[in-house]
Amino acid sequence: MEEVTSQEAAESPRGHFQPLENQSECLSPELRFLQDTDMEQGFSGGFPISKPDGISEREQDLQVFDLESKNREVIRGDCSDGETREENKLLIPKRKISEEVHSYKVRVGKFKQDIAQVPETREVYKSEDRLERLQEILRKFLFLEREFRQITISKKTFSSEKNTEPEKSFSLDSTLDTDQRVLRIQTTDDSKYDMNFNQNPAVGEQEPINLTENFQSTDYKESLMDLSHLNKWESMPTTDRSYKCDTCGKTFHQASALTRHQRIHTREKPYKCKECEKSFSQSSSLSRHKRIHTREKSYKCEASDKSCDAPDKSCSQSSDVLQHKKGHAKAKSYKCGTCERVFSRSVHLTQHQRTHKDMSCKCTVCGSDFCHTSYLVEHQRLHHQEKSYEYDECGLAYVKQQGIRFQEKPYSCNECGKDFRLNSHLIQHQRIHTGEKLHECNECGKSFSQTSCLIQHHKMHRKEKSYEYNNYEESFSHSSDLTLQQEVPIRERVFDCDAWEENFSQRAHLIQHERVHTKEKPYECSELGETFSQVQASFNM
């Protein structure tokens, strides 16, 4: 038999009890029968008593405590013979582990007496049989006494490196109210089966613990009242446990998930943005939308190398930053083995490698090499003079659609050799040589070769001056005259006529005016031989 040293005892988990209140009720007949049966089988108070190695019998101290939901008490021994009431109590063994550990003092009282202090205690079980007996006692207690109002069901995988048998420990959780006690079982890393009764909330918080194996539900975590509820739950088919949508028949394990799904059919959008009044069906969608208004960018690209076009780029959504980070993984991953140039796509690398190799695209006419077929096709059009784009107005065709049409003047005058882009311009020009004047003035009978000249002539008859100068209340028949008048004020006209002392804003106007005095006519018509003082007069003939 191995002895438990004081050092091992000090390192072992501790179990503390909070003060319990007394209760005046006695044991029920079922509990009395259970207690008597257990005592005959070598149990004390419904729990197996196993003395660990190295601990003498005289160090055992039995304590009785009540597990009722409201009032509790601790007494030593059984109920008094003179008492007519039966105390509803269970006996739990408490043992002193080591002298180095602070000695415990249990205030034993009769009825209506609390526990002031309960020392550290630990019950060690080495055999599976004793553990199964303890589990049987716990199950009987659950059926007889409805003390445990809630049972947390879960399953965990047992693992141990020292022993091949699974390792389990028990704990009584008193962090809840007395009417909501939870019995839990958890896995441990110890090399022995440990039974810990921990009722002090201040001592180590533990994860939700497994109940005994017979109470475990392998599929779900549910809060059940007793074993009958668990059996009823296990007997239900999986389809009955889920939540089903009546519209599309889709099933969900949670009612909240079904509620969110049904908003797709009802088009309900209960979450509304206060700024733009846009509605959303889920709160997460509203949170993402609010980042647009606040310009919050919670997701940042932490890449600082040159491969990132925008270092420390921030995104408002995680999907955007993930897409951005993919660019770093794939950015410039294709490298040319000849010149070590790097490309982001394999197609670009293939096109670049053609420049190092023999040009695959070669012109059959002149022998020029090209790395792209599009360049070769464009080059061959020059040799074959292919004119793919035809101009509808004049019937001319061009290699390119834009830019070339205005560089060519296919219409030429036979008399003077002048070229024109449009046929209408050539016809208008030929009227100068032929002297044809189709446009005649109705008032004076004067004829003109162009309609623009006739319109200008009509303004002279009507003295129309549609362009008015607001500052000096003057009007002009031509917009160009108005523009010149606005640019140069009257007092700034520096060109004066010596004969009439008239001022002009431009030197050309002064020279033209002086011809009135000198009667000079420098413009001569080549056909009729007449001379004119102004260019416009020669065109108006």
Curated annotation (Swiss-Prot):
Q: Could you tell me the keywords of this UniProt record?
A: Metal-binding, Nucleus, Repeat, Zinc, Zinc-finger
Where is coiled-coil annotated?
none
User: Which PROSITE patterns does the annotation name?
Assistant: ZINC_FINGER_C2H2_1, ZINC_FINGER_C2H2_2
Q: Give an example GO cellular component term for this record.
A: nucleus
Q: Which molecular-function annotations from GO does this UniProt entry contain?
A: zinc ion binding
A Gene Ontology annotation in the biological process aspect, one of them, is: regulation of DNA-templated transcription
Q: What is its main location?
A: nucleus
Matches recorded under Pfam families: zf-C2H2 (PF00096)
Q: Where is this region: Disordered?
A: 1-22
Task: State the family it belongs to.
Answer: Belongs to the krueppel C2H2-type zinc-finger protein family.
Instruction: Summarize the subunit comment.
Output: Interacts with VAV1 and CDK4. Interacts with INTS13; promoting association with the integrator complex.
Q: What is the annotated role of this protein in its UniProt record?
A: Probable transcription factor.
Protein name (Swiss-Prot/TrEMBL) = Zinc finger protein 655
Give the organism, scientific name: Mus musculus
What's the gene?
Znf655
